[in-house]
Amino acid sequence: MSIEVSNESGIDVSETELVSVARFVIGKMDVNPGAELSMVLLDTAAMADLHMRWMDLPGPTDVMSFPMDELEPGGRPDAPEPGPAMLGDIVLCPEFAAEQAAAAGHSLGHELALLTIHGVLHLLGYDHGEPDEEKEMFALQDRLLEEWVAEQVQAYQQDRQDERDRRLLDKSRYFDEP
């Protein structure tokens, strides 16, 4: 899976975290592991321009998605395996997202992870134009975010335990040559 990130926003964000959450969602949604995704981070002026040009709406927004190939999660079990495809582009505005994060009482990293999930789901055909669609998409988005955060916490705890184990073994000189 290829995920490219281009940060043109002027705001320092963890590209590694963005790739991690995108990769997690793509995997959970059974998208071909050879799929490609492009993520672009823009400042508010550039995002406002894009928002007006594509959605005919004034001002910046938090996330926009531009699907390339029509991909859907899962599929019929007897269907032939689709080949790798270009999912599309997700455009994020960290400055706008920071305002939303402050209003919601969580970190910019949390907000960008949420918006990345939102963007990937749009690329996979999910929408929130109708109440039923919104309920389905937002429930899935929340579940995926919760699962990704749990996976990150577990990996962090495992890394800490591995480090403690390594230090203990070093102190015991268990691996010293006789």
UniProtKB/Swiss-Prot annotation:
<dbReference type="InterPro" id="IPR023091">
    <property type="entry name" value="MetalPrtase_cat_dom_sf_prd"/>
</dbReference>
<feature type="compositionally biased region" description="Basic and acidic residues">
    <location>
        <begin position="159"/>
        <end position="178"/>
    </location>
</feature>
<dbReference type="Pfam" id="PF02130">
    <property type="entry name" value="YbeY"/>
</dbReference>
<keyword id="KW-0479">Metal-binding</keyword>
<dbReference type="GO" id="GO:0004222">
    <property type="term" value="F:metalloendopeptidase activity"/>
</dbReference>
<keyword id="KW-0690">Ribosome biogenesis</keyword>
<comment type="function">
    <text>Single strand-specific metallo-endoribonuclease involved in late-stage 70S ribosome quality control and in maturation of the 3' terminus of the 16S rRNA.</text>
</comment>
<keyword id="KW-0963">Cytoplasm</keyword>
<keyword id="KW-0862">Zinc</keyword>
<dbReference type="GO" id="GO:0005737">
    <property type="term" value="C:cytoplasm"/>
</dbReference>
<dbReference type="GO" id="GO:0006364">
    <property type="term" value="P:rRNA processing"/>
</dbReference>
<comment type="similarity">
    <text>Belongs to the endoribonuclease YbeY family.</text>
</comment>
<keyword id="KW-0255">Endonuclease</keyword>
<feature type="region of interest" description="Disordered">
    <location>
        <begin position="156"/>
        <end position="178"/>
    </location>
</feature>
<dbReference type="InterPro" id="IPR002036">
    <property type="entry name" value="YbeY"/>
</dbReference>
<protein>
    <recommendedName>
        <fullName>Endoribonuclease YbeY</fullName>
        <ecNumber>3.1.-.-</ecNumber>
    </recommendedName>
</protein>
<keyword id="KW-0378">Hydrolase</keyword>
<feature type="binding site">
    <location>
        <position position="122"/>
    </location>
    <ligand>
        <name>Zn(2+)</name>
    </ligand>
</feature>
<keyword id="KW-0540">Nuclease</keyword>
<dbReference type="InterPro" id="IPR020549">
    <property type="entry name" value="YbeY_CS"/>
</dbReference>
<dbReference type="GO" id="GO:0008270">
    <property type="term" value="F:zinc ion binding"/>
</dbReference>
<keyword id="KW-0698">rRNA processing</keyword>
<dbReference type="GO" id="GO:0004521">
    <property type="term" value="F:RNA endonuclease activity"/>
</dbReference>
<feature type="binding site">
    <location>
        <position position="118"/>
    </location>
    <ligand>
        <name>Zn(2+)</name>
    </ligand>
</feature>
<feature type="binding site">
    <location>
        <position position="128"/>
    </location>
    <ligand>
        <name>Zn(2+)</name>
    </ligand>
</feature>
